[in-house]
Amino acid sequence: MKVELDSFSGTKIYPGRGTLFVRGDSKIFRFQSSKSASLFHQRKNPRRISWTVLYRRQHKKGISEESAKRRTRKTVKNQRAIVGASLELIKERRSQKPSDRKAARDVKLAKDKEAKKADKAARKAEKAKSAAAGAQSKVSKQQSKGAFQKVHATSR
């Protein structure tokens, strides 16, 4: 036994009951009663008519005893070690007081600044050394013999 559904109200239509309405675009609508057919032709919205299945579904009627509320699982935060930091190290850093952390940061920054300064001074000394050596070695054989030096144009 094939049971159809009313296109408007959503109620069951048993064999031998109801009517068919075929629209101009060949879409078929089945109605259980002339009441639902009439409301369909008046272009009424079944969600706003209280006795239809769509209305009852939208307003959660008659299903409260059927399905209990679904429980959602609570997320639990878990501490894990990451690359370059063990779990103990992370816990130790977390337990540090902000003032201690700030002091450690300042010490590290000062140390880095000193290292950068020393590196810069070393590079400057190296550059000066190479410049002094370079000035002597840049003279070619021709120039050392007293050959004519080309004068570069200073104006355009």
Swiss-Prot record:
UniProt entry tagged with the keyword Ribonucleoprotein: yes
Residue ranges, annotated region (Disordered): 87-156
A Pfam family of this chain: Ribosomal_L24e
Top-level taxon: Eukaryota
Biased composition (Low complexity): 130-147
CDD domains cross-referenced by the UniProt entry: Ribosomal_L24e_L24
Family annotation (InterPro entries): L24e/L24_sf, Ribosomal_eL24, Ribosomal_eL24-rel_N, Ribosomal_eL24_CS
UniProt biased composition (Basic and acidic residues): 89-129
Annotated keywords: Ribonucleoprotein, Ribosomal protein
Keyword Transcription regulation appears in the UniProt entry: no
Family matches, as Gene3D superfamilies: 6.10.250.1270, Ribosomal protein L24e
GO molecular function: mRNA binding; structural constituent of ribosome
GO cellular component: cytosolic large ribosomal subunit
Family affiliation: Belongs to the eukaryotic ribosomal protein eL24 family.
Name the UniProt record assigns to this protein: Large ribosomal subunit protein eL24
